[in-house]
Swiss-Prot record:
GO biological-process terms attached to the record: cellular response to oxygen-containing compound; glucose homeostasis; glucose metabolic process; positive regulation of protein secretion
Compartments where located: Secreted
Subunit structure comment from the entry: Heterodimer of a B chain and an A chain linked by two disulfide bonds.
PANTHER family, per database record: INSULIN (PTHR11454:SF9), INSULIN/INSULIN GROWTH FACTOR (PTHR11454)
Identification of the protein by name: Insulin
Function summary: Insulin decreases blood glucose concentration. It increases cell permeability to monosaccharides, amino acids and fatty acids. It accelerates glycolysis, the pentose phosphate cycle, and glycogen synthesis in liver.
GO molecular function: hormone activity
UniProt-listed InterPro entries: Insulin, Insulin-like, Insulin-like_sf, Insulin_CS, Insulin_family
Keywords: Carbohydrate metabolism, Disulfide bond, Glucose metabolism, Hormone, Secreted
NADP among keywords: no
PROSITE patterns: INSULIN (PS00262)
Signal peptide extent: none
Homology family: Belongs to the insulin family.
């Protein structure tokens, strides 16, 4: 799960794993797709989308 392309349902699943009970907010304008699907993101970057 470290430093890889995450798109669609894979991205959502990764957010559930990283954020756990905190949950997360998904706003396309935040650039998570550009950051994690079009390029590669880290667990630390994913965690910035947690609540």
């Amino acid at each position: 799960l470290v430093n890889q392309h995450l798109c669609g349902s894979h991205l959502v699943e990764a957010l559930y794993l990283v954020c756990g009970e905190r949950g997360f907010f998904y706003t396309p304008k935040a650039g998570i797709v550009e950051q994690c699907c079009n390029s590669i993101c880290s667990l630390y970057q994913l965690e910035t989308y947690c609540n």
